[in-house]
Amino acid sequence: MAMLSFEKKYRVRGGTLIGGDLFDFWVGPFYVGIFGVMTVFFALIGIALIAWNTALGPTWNLWQISVNPPDAKYGLGFAPLAEGGIWQWVSICATGAFVTWALREVEICRKLGIGFHVPFAFSFAIFAYVTLVVIRPVLMGSWSYGFPYGIFTHLDWVSNTGYSYGQFHYNPAHMIAITFFFTTCLALALHGGLVLSALNPDRGEPVKSPEHENTVFRDLVGYSIGTIGIHRLGLFLALSAVFFSAVCMIISGPVLAEGGSWPDWWNWWRNLPIWNP
């Protein structure tokens, strides 16, 4: 892929966190870096382990392939590879790949002299993943509470986990997370629609400026958050959705015991004096 005209001046030495100039180069448009090499290493090992697990299993059907966590009897210890140990090592490799990818993003930001908003945002995705495969299982005392790596088995795990707490939609953190997800979609749709409207005026009309964009929302709702503000708001909404998604899993089991009911948890609300004078 050809280098764009402005890219060459940004391809400079330095900005690395460790390793100095080792792997401080580009392959085509992609910056490598020592963390890029580590990401590829973890990813390849993880993929190889998944292939090995599949070879041990009953099928090569893509929809039915699954790398399952260990049985509850192993607790937080290491399980034999064929009995969940592969899942443990795949989780280690996945975590390593995600973390080193984020550190690669940090190095790119340092080279460009920009803020670290991209790796900061990506770290929330890492937190959500680690919550599911490390934090929640550790709090519940067994790796068996991790989710399986498989298309259908993962969906089954989501369904079974939800119904094991009565009705997961009553989980308060789940409510907040879903609200942020929907609000993120609304904000992005409004922002995207507004920008495209300003860039696609009637034939013969000039492209509209941010002043026009601000005026649309001042006319519509009486206030415009501004061109920078909408991106800050979008980042906040998206990260909040991911954060509360992780929280809703952390409190399901460690806080509300397994077999408990989220609908029943709300009895404190129904029993408030304002409803029962």
UniProtKB/Swiss-Prot annotation:
GO BP field: photosynthetic electron transport in photosystem II
Keywords, sorted A to Z: Bacteriochlorophyll, Chlorophyll, Chromophore, Electron transport, Iron, Magnesium, Membrane, Metal-binding, Photosynthesis, Reaction center, Transmembrane, Transmembrane helix, Transport
Entries under Pfam families matching the protein: Photo_RC
The keyword Nuclease appears for this protein: no
Matching PROSITE patterns: REACTION_CENTER (PS00244)
Regions crossing the membrane: 30-52, 84-106, 113-135, 173-195, 233-255
GO annotations of cellular component type: plasma membrane light-harvesting complex; plasma membrane-derived chromatophore membrane
Binding site for (7R,8Z)-bacteriochlorophyll b: 154, 174
Chief site of localization: membrane
Residues that, per the record, bind Fe cation: 191, 231
Localization in the cell: Cellular chromatophore membrane
Keyword Transmembrane helix on entry: yes
Membrane-topology descriptor: Multi-pass membrane protein
Matches recorded under Gene3D superfamilies: Photosystem II protein D1-like
GO molecular function, one term: bacteriochlorophyll binding
Superkingdom per UniProt: Bacteria
InterPro entries registered for this protein in UniProt: Photo_II_D1/D2_sf, Photo_RC_L, Photo_RC_L/M, Photo_RC_L/M_CS
Function: The reaction center is a membrane-bound complex that mediates the initial photochemical event in the electron transfer process of photosynthesis.
Family: Belongs to the reaction center PufL/M/PsbA/D family.
Assembly behavior: Reaction center is composed of four bacteriochlorophylls, two bacteriopheophytins, two ubiquinones, one iron, and three highly hydrophobic polypeptide chains (designated L, M, and H).
Protein name: Reaction center protein L chain
Lineage of source species: Bacteria, Pseudomonadati, Pseudomonadota, Alphaproteobacteria, Hyphomicrobiales
